Curated annotation (Swiss-Prot):
Belongs to the glycosyltransferase 2 family. Plant cellulose synthase-like D subfamily. It holds the Pfam family Cellulose_synt. The gene is CSLD4. Residues 207-222 have a biased composition (Acidic residues). The active site is at 452, 905. The keyword Manganese does not apply. It comes from Oryza sativa subsp. japonica (Rice). It comes from the Eukaryota. The keyword tRNA-binding does not apply. This is Cellulose synthase-like protein D4. GO terms for biological process: cell wall organization; cellulose biosynthetic process; plant-type cell wall organization or biogenesis; plant-type primary cell wall biogenesis. Disulfide bonds: none annotated. One of its GO terms (cellular component) is Golgi apparatus.
Length: 1215
């Protein structure tokens, strides 16, 4: 029995037409009233052929009015589909109204933001508590599934095109998790493929119970077909490219084996434009105008492999006109220092031997420290990435990837936060918004926020961020705004209309700006909202508890037990923190309690944004999709966003930030398993949306399989224009790091770094190399094999052993059973995590056609949908963040971030370089990759430097000292790491050397017996070479002289304040075992829009912290040095003026060095004065008077030798 299809008014009807002649030679046209009528066409080149429509045939289910695709006389034939718009007629009016309503419902279903079961459930678990999921009640966010909405509206018909049969439910739900309604017959045809709704494979449990739906044999066939589909052979694409009929093997369709026609590869390789076609998927579009005549003399055969040989990156050395003089000056200054120190040792000062000895010891150490700092700077390089080649190689249609899906590997972004009070949630929200809007394939990006404090404020701020991201991310993609951090974008002082051509940009920018302002208000009001909500719920709980206790007391009194009744009146004093759905927050409470304290709470995982689909989801007009802006033609998908708070319990060491990072590594491996990891601090946002692509260029280029991480320079905002405390640190990031890039690679500095996941797992590089000979230039290739352990090894031996990647399949076809068996012992007991390791290694490989790559992956292997995220996966992730998971494993010792130091970043990078890995320094040319905030207050800056220096002292006294590095580390790379661990000890000699001028002025002695011409000549040569080296460094690094001088000043400030304290703390930890604890550096908030990121306020408000004086014990040594030198200059000047035999040379020598010390400490003194104009003038007057009094008293106490008798006889009198 036939049925009339319900088509909407004016709906297009697709008709397949092919030119076929009748047997009699006349053209006969036949029409069919169906949706599709595919008819074979034998030639597209025939212009005389007439059009014929085949008779309509029904399929087996009598649902489609048209021929089956597999039917027909010739299977190799292809079809042309024409779209015909049928106008509405009176007999179709009723169906049109119904179908229009159905179409509107479908459109609303597409554009409505949905929350899956995973994104609407918070998972908790940990020690002595079961893993459970708590479904959150989101009333206003569209939490109902598509199936429930369809059931509520009564729309239970099949959604397949041309079918209106009733849909079937498997266990009360559709066969696919996306909620796409499909009937039984359509499902039987699609069961072996993908769901027509979400374009992903059907769930494993979606098969029906009927025996005629999908049998076991069909399952085996489905598995084999999916494997064949993953391989994507060229023959399967025969129908999807514009290849003419002559390219098919004749008679292949009638061979009776049911297989499609084979593709003639030999003929295809030598086809011309005339027979193959011009402008198709494989032919370059930049050819000549001879599109129909084949190759001519002027045309060259296209080189289809040219793009594979184009490099993704370029490395250029510094110009020899700059580098050669730079190296020569280093050699000249080294020789001059050697002769100078030899002369100083041979010419002591007999009048002040102790002064001479101290000065010589300091000068020898300074020369040694300068040599360690200069040697790694001999080979600076510059690198550049080509994003066009990256897009062409990994995102263009190919035979294995006809749809042009992205073949780029996945990236998991880690954002760490520990205390929302010192790290404002709005700062973290801006960082996450910039990550979600990054220019990278949405389905390949995942963002994880680690809240090490387990605060509800961070959780709800992240939920607000996910809600605002649905407006902000499409706005960024539509208009291509930069930067994609809303606070920085709306706060920048420039013309935001530059290069904008869309007429709706101004209107939509105004809407988004207002929405962002409301978003900031909501985030800023969260602490008060949480407090009021918790107080209300706690008050209700207390009332219910009191009522229940009064009832029990009354019952006890009636029973005659008065004491029990009086005791029952006491109410519970526990003050819980409540979530918005009326349940207890499983993390840290505002009033700490058992299992809810900062160091004692369960593990929490919540997917705020579920993983996106593999196919783009285009938006629509604001009125249709319910959004704020028009997103027509804009992909509105969002990357996966996950909240993670690891479990903490008393008695288990949580290892600070390194432990949190390792917990994120394990969680992400189970939930998304991106082969690359980007680490960002909560105050470092993505300033260049293409930064991730630039990092991938270095990872995926030739030799990229040996790159463990790509480090980006740190750039800062909110720093005062004069950069008083050298917060930009450009000498380190633009000079030292560029120079190390020419060796084995830069250090890891804690943020803005893209890691290779397998390198973090402690595996060795694919091709290890030992460096020997002069400067480590002679290389020896190693063939690494697994060494069997005999007996007990020390921890150091275990760290130095090789750990090669367990291959998915060896060349001989067998797996490395021994290596696979060792993985659970190294990585823990999670089988899911262990199984993800070889998958991540395979996805991080280079392409097979990359030059020099022997074990690459085929192109298009990653252009497949991601596996859906289910509750079992999240429950497994809860297990790997438990407090006891790392026990008896190698986490923190060899795997992941290394424990035992407050500078875990430097140690982690050192371990990778020590195994033979390389790193790359990526400086983006046009825009900074990432930007963050820096502490502009003097006290905060000194405490930051103290933490870094203390970590260096710990490294120096540990087995991570570069003196014990393996032969796989280059010699100059060892020198750089050794200098990183030794530089705090220079502060001991710097303190003494800064006091030597004052001691010399007070005592009237000098470090040399007399200022000879030889001594002055040595000083002149050493000073001139230092200045010339600085100028050349400025030339090849691009920094300014002002920035170089600020760095020199703060080197003295830090060396006389924070570094000595770091040496003392490090010695106490090594000798006495005193543990070192640090507090977080407070991040400036940006909630008001005046300070912080991109603030628009005036200088006084933006840099208020710069002028705030907070006293610290670290300020005592620099203040003492300044006062002593100032008083010494005054005393020496007064003594020389009143002396009968003045020694001006000693005064000038001592005063010159004291002035040198005071010039370097000038920013420190300026910071102590606070805001300009706030210090009263009387302070300067009294300071001058006190200095004069001290000077005169010193002259009276210790007068010159010629004036003692006169002063003693006549008393003290002014001249």
């Amino acid at each position: 029995m036939s049925r009339r299809l319900s088509l909407p008014a004016g709906a297009p009807v697709t008709v397949a037409v092919s030119p076929v002649r009748s047997p009699g030679g006349d053209a006969v046209v036949r029409r069919g009233s169906g949706l599709t009528s595919p008819v074979p066409r034998h030639s597209l080149g025939s212009s005389t052929a007439t059009l014929q429509v085949s008779p309509v045939r029904r399929s087996g289910g009598s649902r489609y009015l048209g021929a089956s695709r597999d039917g027909g006389a010739d299977e190799s034939a292809e079809f042309v589909h024409y779209t015909v718009h049928i106008p509405p007629t009176p007999d179709r009016a009723t169906a049109s109204v119904a179908s229009e309503a159905e179409a509107a419902a479908e459109a609303e279903e597409v554009h409505r933001p949905q929350r899956s079961y995973i994104s609407g459930t918070i998972f908790t678990g940990g020690l002595n508590c079961a893993t459970r999921g708590h479904v959150l009640n989101f009333s206003g966010e569209g939490g109902a599934t598509a199936a429930s909405r369809a059931a509520a509206s009564g729309n239970m018909s099949c959604k397949m095109r041309g079918c209106d049969m009733p849909a079937f439910l498997n266990g009360g739900r559709p066969p696919c998790d996306c909620g796409f309604m499909i009937c039984k017959e359509c499902y039987a045809e699609c069961a072996a493929g993908n769901c027509p709704g979400c374009k992903e494979a059907f769930s494993a449990g979606s098969d029906t119970d009927e025996s005629d739906s999908v049998t076991d044999d069909d399952d085996d066939e489905a598995v084999s077909s999916s494997e064949e589909r993953d391989q994507l052979p060229l023959t399967s694409m025969a129908r999807k490219f514009s290849v003419v009929h002559s390219m098919k093997v004749p008679g292949a369709a009638a061979n009776g084996n049911g297989k499609p026609a084979e593709f003639d590869h030999a003929r295809w390789l030598f086809e011309t434009k005339g027979t193959y076609g011009y402008g198709n998927a494989l032919w370059p579009k930049d050819g000549h105008a001879h599109s129909g005549a084949g190759f001519v003399a002027a045309d060259e055969p296209p080189n289809f492999g040219a793009r594979c040989r184009r490099p993704l990156t370029r490395k250029t050395s510094v110009s020899q006109a700059i580098l050669s003089p730079y190296r020569l000056l280093i050699a000249i200054r080294l020789v001059a220092l050697g002769f100078f120190l030899a002369w100083r040792i041979r010419h002591p000062n007999p009048e002040a031997v102790w002064l001479w000895a101290m000065s010589v010891a300091c000068e020898v150490w300074f020369a040694f420290s300068w040599l360690l700092d200069s040697l790694p700077k001999l080979c600076p390089v510059h690198r550049a990435a080509d994003l066009a080649v990256l897009a062409e190689r990994f995102e263009s249609p190919t035979a294995r990837n006809p749809k042009g899906r992205s073949d780029l590997p996945g990236i998991d972004v880690f954002v760490t936060s520990a205390d929302p009070e010192k790290e404002p949630p709005l700062v973290t929200a801006n960082t996450i918004l910039s990550i979600l809007a990054a220019d990278y394939p949405v389905e390949k990006l995942a963002c994880y926020l680690s809240d090490d404090g387990g605060a509800l404020l961070s959780f709800e701020a992240l939920a607000e961020t996910a809600s605002f991201a649905r407006t902000w991310v499409p706005f960024c993609r539509k208009h291509g705004v930069e930067p994609r951090c809303p606070e920085a974008y709306f706060g920048q002082k420039r013309d935001f209309l530059k290069n904008k051509v869309r007429v709706d940009f101004v209107r939509e920018r105004r809407k988004v700006k207002r929405e962002y302002d409301e978003f900031k208000v909501r985030v800023n009001s969260l602490p008060e909202a949480i407090r009021r909500r918790s107080d209300a719920y706690n008050a209700g709980e207390e009332l219910r508890a009191r009522r229940r206790q009064q009832e029990e007391a009354a019952a006890a009194a009636a029973a005659g037990n008065g004491e029990l009744g009086a005791a029952a009146v006491e109410t519970a004093a526990v003050k819980a923190t409540w979530m918005s759905d009326g349940s207890h927050w499983p993390g840290t409470w505002t009033c700490p309690a058992a299992d809810h304290a900062r160091g004692d709470h369960a593990g929490i995982i919540q997917a705020m944004l579920a993983p996106p689909t593999s196919e783009p989801v285009m938006g629509g007009e604001a009125a249709e999709c319910g959004g704020l802006i028009d997103t027509t033609g804009v992909d509105v998908r969002l990357p996966m966003l996950v909240y993670v708070s690891r479990e903490k319990r008393p008695g288990y060491d949580h290892n600070k930030k390194a432990g949190a990072m390792n917990a994120l590594v394990r969680t992400s491996a189970i939930m998304s398993n991106g082969p690359f990891i980007l680490n960002l601090d909560c105050d470092h946002y993505v300033h260049n949306s293409s930064a991730l692509r630039e990092g991938m260029c270095f990872m995926l280029d030739r030799g990229g399989d040996r790159v463990c991480f790509v480090q980006f320079p740190q750039r800062f905002e909110g720093v005062d224009p004069s950069d008083r405390y050298a917060n930009h640190n450009l000498v380190f990031f633009d000079v030292s790091m560029r120079a190390m890039d020419g060796l084995q690679g830069p250090m890891y500095v804690g943020t803005g770094c893209v890691f290779r996941r397998t390198a973090l797992y402690g595996f060795s590089p694919p091709r290890a190399t030992e460096h020997h000979g002069w400067l480590g230039r002679r290389k020896i290739k190693l063939f690494l094999t697994k060494k069997k352990s005999m007996g007990k090894k020390t921890d150091r031996a275990e760290d130095d052993t090789e750990m090669m990647l367990p291959p998915i399949e060896d060349d001989d076809g067998g797996a490395d059973i021994e290596a696979s068996a060792m993985l659970p012992k190294r990585f823990g007991g999670s089988a899911t995590f262990v199984a993800s390791i070889p998958v991540a290694e395979y996805q991080g490989r280079l392409l097979q056609d990359t030059p020099g790559c022997h074990h690459g992956r085929p192109a298009g292997a990653l252009a497949v949908p991601r596996e859906p995220l289910d509750a079992a996966t999240v429950a497994e992730a809860i297990g790997v963040i438990s407090c006891f998971y790392e026990e008896k494993t190698e986490w923190g010792r060899r795997i992941g971030w290394i424990y035992g130091s407050v500078t875990e970043d430097v140690v982690t990078g050192y371990r990778m370089h020590n195994r033979g890995w390389r790193s790359v320094y990526c400086v983006t040319p046009r825009r900074d990759a990432f930007r963050g905030t820096a502490p502009i207050n003097l006290t905060d800056r000194l405490h930051q430097v103290l933490r870094w220096a203390t970590g260096s002292v710990e490294i120096f006294f540990s087995r991570n000292n570069a003196l014990f590095a393996s032969p796989r580390m280059k010699l100059l790379q060892r020198v750089a790491y050794f200098n990183a661990g030794m530089y705090p000890f220079t502060s001991v000699f710097l303190l003494a050397y800064c006091l030597l001028p004052a001691v010399s002025l007070f005592s009237g002695k000098f470090i040399v017996q007399r200022l000879s011409a030889t001594f002055l000549a040595f000083l002149l040569v050493i000073t001139l070479t230092l200045c010339l080296l600085a100028l050349l460094e400025i030339k090849w690094s691009g920094i300014t002289l002002h920035e170089w001088w600020r760095n020199e000043q703060f080197w003295v400030i830090g060396g006389t304040s924070a570094h000595p304290a770091a040496v003392l703390q490090g010695l106490l930890k090594v000798i006495a075992g005193v543990d070192i604890s640090f507090t977080l550096t407070s991040k400036p908030g940006n909630g008001g829009g005046d300070g912080g990121v991109g603030g628009e306020g005036n200088d006084d408000e933006a840099f208020a912290e710069l002028y705030e004086v907070r006293w610290s014990y670290l300020m005592v040594p620099p203040v003492t040095i300044m006062m002593v030198n100032a008083v010494a200059i005054a005393v020496a000047a007064a003594r020389t003026l009143y002396s009968e035999f003045p020694q001006w040379s000693k005064l000038l020598g001592g005063a010159f060095f004291s002035f040198w010390v005071l010039c370097h400490l000038y920013p420190f003194a300026k910071g102590l004065l606070g805001r300009r104009g706030r210090v009263p003038t009387i302070v300067f007057v009294w300071s001058g008077l006190i200095s004069m009094i001290i000077s005169l008293l010193w002259v009276y106490i210790n007068p010159p030798a010629g004036a003692r008798e006169r002063i003693g006889g006549g008393g003290f009198s002014f001249p």
